[in-house]
Amino acid sequence: MSKAGFRGGVHPPDRKKATESLPVADARLPERVVIPMAQHIGAPAQPIVKVGDLVKKGQKVGEAQGPVSVPVHASISGKVIAVGSFPSPMGFDAPAVVIESDGADEWAEDLAGSEDYMSMNPDALRAIIKEAGIVGMGGATFPTHVKLSPPKEKKIKYAVLNGAECEPYLTSDSRLMEESPADVIEGLKIIMNVLQVTEGFVGIESNKQGAIRAVSEEAGKVACELVMETYYERDGLEFEVPKGCKMSVKVVPLEVKYPQGSEKQLIKATVGLEVPPGYLPMDVGAVVQNVSTAAAIYNAVRYGRPLIERIVTVTGPGIRKPKNLRVRIGTLFDELIEQCGGLTDAAAKVVMGGPMMGIAQPALMVPVIKGTSGIVALTGKET
């Protein structure tokens, strides 16, 4: 199978074997969570609850401030026990709401989704995405509704999902694609509806064969919604496309190298377009989103669920029992590390994200946020 890519790049050891085959497990329901108001690029949310308030899972606890901002929501049900400034894994103190669990884990009652999301107006979909607090989950944390609102003079033709996951150690995206490919593809379809485009792409590095197979099967069903008439083949993967198909999704196996997941490199590898220096993806007609973001969009639009949890890879040579965990936003790093057997004696540094672009943590009493794809414990050899 030929693989798409770009000129240059580096080839760090991927070091994913410890978790690449481990199914996602649910982390324990935390006894308390710390929900930062600044989990995204742009203006932090403003707390709208006070100490003593009772909240439900999915209830809004922070309101967006301005156009480049999103709300934040309770990830557990319980009582607000503090509102103030707390350490963030981004390296600074940030306003946050602390919730103590009541053990019931009850959803807020006013959450509702729609089965008919492909017939919804793009503006209505953007509003749902914003109200759900969805941001880029690959680490950039840019508000998704803003990224899906390009200027009218920018003609968007392609929606691209980033499933490269080129950072060493991390496997949260690959496990999502392998275990929940329908969520990813349905999310992509919603993105395509918002952007009013007919061509979608999913770029996945070729060392993730399980993810490629699972997502390719779901991508084929996009065409299967209409009557099949023709076949075509790309990179060794067969697709059925009906004559006059209104929407198609193509899975593109990518070369394994870094930074394959960078937007400009990904667009070159999937769509074949070069984004010139000083220009943005929208200037060549493309919008890129992470696969986890796409899945979050689907769950928000279909089921009314705001972004209150995500998959986190807890791994590295400094972790005794690496795992892929489905984690509530606001769960403290030290709790997750404890659920993975704790740190080894050789652990020297803990990083949020991967070793290439991650943020070293001076302390572990910091919460998982929307952009936390991994918690990696490194030894002195890696640092």
Which residues make up each language-model segment?
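Ferredoxin-like iron-sulfur electron-transfer modules
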Residues: V34-A43, A64-S69, V376-T383
